[in-house]
Amino acid sequence: YGIKEDEIVFVYVGRMAKEKNIEELLWYQKSVQKNIKLVLVGDGPYRTTLEEKAKEYQVTDSVIFTGMVSPDEVARYYQIGDLFVSASTSETQGMTYDEALAGGVPLLCRKDDCLKEVVTEGKNGWQYENESMYLECIQKWKEFSEDEKRRMRNTAVRTADQFSKESFAKRVERVYLAALEERKRRNVYAA
């Protein structure tokens, strides 16, 4: 893809649909330094529109659309990323967040309730609410030493371990069991 060694790579993996708000990432790309590439991995009904927006915003030199990739290649794309970026506020399960973290890729995501238990600001990523916050997070990343970046990547992996499918299933099970216990308790008192 012609990515240079000294370039910072932001990677997005997922379906290209309007509700994913990828257009925001393209808009912000106008404001970032020229040594940052945005790699958009995936396909979907909104891809053509996004490619047109990239031209309109004059960011085609710094944005790469990979198209659909096979599931066994996805990990490779996470690995080229310095940060995983997402502007979506419509995630319910957020598997791509987990995949990025598992690959040691810190997150830079639009603030979303589904991430409040996942993102620890400045430790495994950041959440932003607007363009200035987005740019501020990028500046922090750029100012980190290699050791700080390594620590952040390691924390990302530990976070993914904590939120793996197994631990997610156990958390859901605890919630259901607590709900059943509460229901039982209420039925006892109702009788």
Model-derived segments and spans:
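A conserved mid-protein helix/loop that constitutes part of the nucleotide-sugar donor-binding site
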Residues: 8-31, 36-38, 45-51
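Nucleotide-activated donor-binding/catalytic signature segment of Leloir-type glycosyltransferases, i.e.
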Residues: 51-69
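Short alpha-helical donor nucleotide-sugar binding micro-motif in glycosyltransferases
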Residues: 68-69, 76-81
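Short alpha-helical segment that forms part of, or immediately flanks, the ligand-binding pocket
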Residues: 75, 93, 97-102, 116-117
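Aromatic "clamp/platform" in nucleotide-sugar-dependent glycosyltransferases that forms part
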Residues: 89
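Short hydrophobic beta-strand element within catalytic cores of glycosyltransferases
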Residues: 106-109
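Conserved acidic donor-binding segment of nucleotide-sugar-dependent glycosyltransferases
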Residues: 121-132, 140-146
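A charged, aromatic-enriched C-terminal amphipathic alpha-helix characteristic of glycosyltransferases
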Residues: 150-185
